[in-house]
Amino acid sequence: MTKKAKKTNSKNSKIHTGVLVLENKKVFKGIGIGYQGEATGEVCFNTSLTGYQEIISDPSYAGQIINFTFPHIGNVGTNKEDHESDKIWTKGVVFNSEITSPSNYRSFQHLDAWLKKNKIVGITGLDTRSLTNFIRDKGAPKGTIAYSKTGKFNISKLTNSTTKWTGLKNLDLAEKVTTSKNYIWKGFKTWKKETGYKKNNKSSFHVVAIDYGIKKNILRYFSDFNCKVTVVSCKTSADKILTLKPNGIFLSNGPGDPAATGKYAINIIKNLIKKNLPIFGICLGHQILALALGAKTKKMKLGHRGANHPVKNLIHDNVEITSQNHGFEVIKENLPKNIEVTHKSLFDNSIEGIRLKNKPVFSVQYHPESNPGPQDSVYLFQEFINNMKKNAKKKRS
């Protein structure tokens, strides 16, 4: 008489084809998705509910493994238009729930297939709340994410890869993600349901954007405000930038340690400030501008990443809900006297915006272009436009 096969719990019998190994040897197991392989980076978390395609394609995430705190990621698939850069620099992604079939009229490809195409290692079915709590309590750790259909992993080797990696501190990633060739932005505006990404051929001002890892939605907003934008690599000299005859300079977002990028970027910015041109910086651009003005930066314990960060505008005495993505900050102690703090975080009172007292120069730590996120701070683009208008009028008089 043959014995009946014992029923097994399908959930428990599932092979763990994905692992995340942290530097303290803590191992999280799940189901691998995307690209089969392994990748090492800093493990961070993002609290956004939407916009995963824009987040993953943001160059500022170079060198990082993103843990998404919202449980359902991938529901709307991916499309051909919403990339924030042409190349994906994110090291890996971690999701709580299995990706469902996409349901959206703009969807072109399943998120799993998109991750595979872009060689991004991912895991689903992982306890993202536990991982988030760990990061919150201990700080953002180094980690190695791996996916193998066999479910066989050399944990010792993965741990070794994790501990050997130097981390983001003192790492210049802007030089890796910056454009290899200067170019003029095509002029596409921000997305509208009725028109999609419509092209704008008008140009009232010429902005030169220094690319430390620029997001496309920043360029789209400049098109919304009738600006022609020339994007230059992060090591382009001030003299070469000035030959382009810009009305204003934009310092972009980007990944890595601002102090490391500052080794070449600070002198470029100092020379541009001397020319009294309007300057506007976002995120890494904000940090490098602060360094050029004599301030200092430091690595944060876990950083700010999400689309719901409240920021106090100290000039207008109001609160803006902002989109953020940064792991370094400007140190608020012993700021040079010529720097005025304009915005601060209502989470931890860290500096979120500065301006130079005697010149048309300002920057913010957060992302006014959102994508994803609220649009409370789009007015900053208008302030930059106003500075260029005033500067042009002054030159004519």
Predicted features and spans:
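RNA-binding accessory domains that recognize and position tRNA/RNA substrates
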Residues: 2-244, 256, 273, 371-373, ...
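Short acidic-glycine loop/turn motifs at beta-strand connectors
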Residues: 22-24, 138, 314-316, 357-358
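Short clusters of small/polar residues that mark proteolytic maturation junctions
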Residues: 32-33, 70, 302, 355, ...
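Proline-centered loop/turn at the N-terminus of a beta-strand
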Residues: 121, 206, 278-280, 296, ...
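Active-site glycine-centered loops adjacent to acidic/histidine catalytic or metal-binding residues
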Residues: 127, 283, 326, 367
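Cysteine-nucleophile active-site neighborhood
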Residues: 247-321, 327-332, 373-391
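Catalytic beta-strand/loop cores that center a nucleophilic Ser/Cys/Thr
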Residues: 318-359, 366, 396-397
